[in-house]
Amino acid sequence: MTRKVSTRTTWEPVAGYSRAVAAGDFVFVSGCTSTSGGEFVHEGDAGAQTTQCITNVAEALERLGASLADVVRTRMFVTDISRWQEYGRAHGAAFGETKPATSMIGVAALVDPRMLIEVEAVAYKPGVGA
């Protein structure tokens, strides 16, 4: 059995995806960007964008009964790899001692040219998908 959540953004129906899917003992969170209330926020600020992305990940997890403490894997897709320390510091601050496995991948662009980062996550929480 799977459970799914949507944020009702304009992108979800166009691309045909869910914000997060709980399956078995795992929650898979789609890439989150620096949006709040459907609007882009924190233009030019790599750290603040990273924090907002992770806030959006946390909100999706919470809707399925999980939290950032359950995250075992993240991927950060960034448009300017030279700012890796800014992204990394914000990621480290958000996850603290959880310290999930992570990758930071440089990409040419994201869906909005103002977006510097997109974060996806996988959480492990026994029974979450039941």
Residue ranges and their predicted role:
Residues 1-55, 59-72, 78-130:
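N-terminal presequence-like segments and the immediate start of the first folded domain
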